[in-house]
Design a protein with these regions (language model features):
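Long, well-ordered alpha-helical scaffolding segments within enzyme catalytic domains
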Residues: 44, 48-54, 110-126, 160-190
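Short aromatic-glycine-(Arg/Gly/Cys) micro-motifs in beta-strand/loop hairpins
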Residues: 193-208, 229
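Active-site histidine-acidic residue metal-binding/catalytic motifs
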Residues: 2-74
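Short, mixed-charge low-complexity intrinsically disordered segments
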Residues: 228-244
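A short, charged, amphipathic alpha-helix used as a generic interaction element across diverse proteins
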Residues: 215-230
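Loop/turn elements at helix/coil->beta-strand transitions in domains of secreted/extracellular proteins
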Residues: 10-11, 53-60, 82-87, 124-128, ...
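Active-site-adjacent mobile loop/cap segments within catalytic or ligand-binding domains
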Residues: 14-16, 22-24, 80-82, 86-93, ...
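A short, glycine/acidic-enriched catalytic loop
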Residues: 20-37, 93-120, 124
Length: 244
């Protein structure tokens, strides 16, 4: 099977949540443990991953947008028909599985994606890894026409606290791994606070009296004390009155 290598950020990728609606339309919870289901746990993580990927400028196709309402056959068909550049399916392993993340792949490009995911998840989540593993018996790997990876995020029993309590953090780690694979700078969507400039003047309107403009308030205060002037922020508000 020849799989495409992603070359540009403008390509759309598919990120889907494991299990959910089954082939006959009934609900497929995936593995379960003490009232927790794979489908529900993975939905929260997938939503977070999609959120951070979109914040990083990546176009994402995902069943998480609609409550995990499609089965994997439909997910793969949609991905193939729309020509997405990459396919990722997010799962967790059954209660008897060992702890640790385990990305699955079948192609060379899939292995590269798996390693990117393993690296960021181990680092950001502090999780053990069961290694990246090649599988040739899974539909989401064999049926896709593009780079594909099935991510086993951990054991529903052994890693329950991580999966249940930190979905946003886990989704962020996944998004970082995907961005690393795509060669796209990761962005968390948070606007960095703008740095204010502090002006030392007699009054805000008296621009000619300005003794200096500073990026730090402490330095502006020293200048104001020396000259008996005031400190104004970029909006003209007096934030400090000199002591001289």
């Amino acid at each position: 099977m020849k799989q495409k290598k992603v070359k540009m950020m403008s390509k759309t990728i598919a990120v889907h949540c494991g299990h959910g609606v089954s082939l006959d339309g009934s609900w497929d919870s995936g593995c379960v443990y003490k009232g927790y289901s794979e489908a529900k746990l993975m939905l929260a993580i997938t939503k977070a991953a999609v959120k951070y990927l979109r914040a990083s400028g990546v176009k994402v196709q995902s069943d998480a947008d609609h409550g995990n309402n499609k089965n994997m056959i439909a997910d793969v068909r949609q991905a193939n028909n729309s020509g997405v550049a990459m396919y990722l399916s997010i799962h967790c392993d059954y209660s008897g599985a060992p702890r640790g993340v385990m990305p699955l792949y079948v192609s060379g490009s899939g292995k590269k994606l798996a390693k990117c995911l393993e690296k960021t998840i181990k680092k950001d989540m502090g999780m053990k890894s069961r290694g990246v593993q090649k599988r040739t018996d899974l539909w989401e790997l064999n049926g896709t026409d593009m780079t594909a990876c099935i991510l086993e995020t951990g054991s529903i029993k052994g890693d329950l606290a991580t999966l249940r309590d930190h979905p946003d953090k886990y989704g962020k780690a996944i998004a970082k791994g995907v961005c690393s694979y795509l060669g796209v700078p990761f962005k968390d969507g948070k606007k960095k606070p703008s740095k204010d400039i502090y002006h030392v003047r007699k009054t805000w309107k008296d621009e000619k009296s300005q003794k200096g403009a500073f990026s730090t308030l402490e330095n502006a205060k020293k200048c104001a004390d020396k000259n008996g002037y005031s400190v104004f922020n970029s909006k003209g508000k007096e934030v400090y009155h000199g002591k001289k």
